[in-house]
């Protein structure tokens, strides 16, 4: 969740984050920058937060200037579930839902999940009637198609189905690794006779 999601006021999910620009770049931005530059990160999701008075989903400064221009991100920017609707409904940006969608698109968001609300039919009508610049939509469409091409979805759009697809997500080795991770991450918070340790041991 890009950016400063864990620095929201009161630790509240999706709340306001008053984070100075230097802290955004040098602390909260560094893990993203490393993933982009060292691993060629191809997908990113803006957080629900409002950072310094601006919803991240509709922030040109964060999604284009910082993320793409400064950090070099070239992949697909996908909304968090319902984030475009939240931008309008909760964060009060845009006169209408489609206005909020257009602001998110212009900011650098390419795709809305889980279904189109801000990127819906009225949003598309703005492009059909010339009320919105088609180049912003073309840029987003190109990024979506590029991601699909990289995944081979044009050659094999439904390469795995049914049991074959289920098999990919239920490998025995994956289950074993998950079980081992769970075992190694357990932390005993209070010993009520679970472990054979005397009460005098600290």
Where are the model-predicted features located?
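Glycoside hydrolase catalytic-domain context in secreted enzymes
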Residues: 1-202
